[in-house]
């Protein structure tokens, strides 16, 4: 469960990223965050795993108050929350399998990390994750030889290899063509339904958000202006979310 209690985020330059956000996301939900550029979508997601700190309020992931975590405790917490970015964050000249196994590094001792001594279990978990996103056959190919869509699947497999119950995604399909974007969204949907993973992603493709997510959260100027079922999102709601104010 993810729970925001009166969460606000103000950046050092005075910009308000979030203002008094209250929401709860239960385990197994597929939630899409929509809104204009700069509305606060990325800020909201990045607060969940502490990439952005909270200025005021409290933010819980299960029983952990993320807003109070610092240093080592925060790094330990992040191991259990998968994060997929718009940029794939892969090591180009390394195999797909090893890129995915890097998700296990925080659990390894320094000696094993230095020499890349992954366990048999690490390898099996990574291979299973690649299978779940349909690119098991690419395991021993270098990451830089894959298409954009395939690289994003590697990122998703790496997040699965963390064995976290929550997957956060920050504009995961914005750099992909429409066909490939739908294929990656299919992966998210399948993982949500088959593994009961909580999916929280922000996305600028409204039509994809409405098609795949069961719940829509719309953000405007750092405030939640809609939070409800995707099938209840109307043209009037979208007009309000995306209307420019002079």
Curated annotation (Swiss-Prot):
Domain ABC transporter: from-to ranges: 2-246
Keyword field contains Metal-binding: no
GO molecular function: ABC-type phosphonate transporter activity; ATP binding; ATP hydrolysis activity
Major site of localization recorded for this protein: membrane
Highest rank taxon of the organism: Bacteria
Top-rank EC class of the record's enzyme: translocase
Membrane topology note: Peripheral membrane protein
Binding sites annotated in the UniProt record for ATP: 35-42
Compartments reported by the entry: Cell membrane
Recorded catalytic activity of this chain's protein: phosphonate(out) + ATP + H2O = phosphonate(in) + ADP + phosphate + H(+)
Keywords of the record: ATP-binding, Cell membrane, Membrane, Nucleotide-binding, Phosphonate transport, Translocase, Transport
UniProt GO cellular component terms: plasma membrane
Entry EC no(s): 7.3.2.2
Function of the molecule: Part of the ABC transporter complex PhnCDE involved in phosphonates import. Responsible for energy coupling to the transport system.
Family: Belongs to the ABC transporter superfamily. Phosphonates importer (TC 3.A.1.9.1) family.
PANTHER family xrefs: AMINO ACID IMPORT ATP-BINDING PROTEIN, PHOSPHONATES IMPORT ATP-BINDING PROTEIN PHNC
Subunit structure: The complex is composed of two ATP-binding proteins (PhnC), two transmembrane proteins (PhnE) and a solute-binding protein (PhnD).
Name of the protein: Phosphonates import ATP-binding protein PhnC
The species this protein was found in: Lactococcus lactis subsp. cremoris (strain SK11)
Gene from which this protein is expressed: phnC
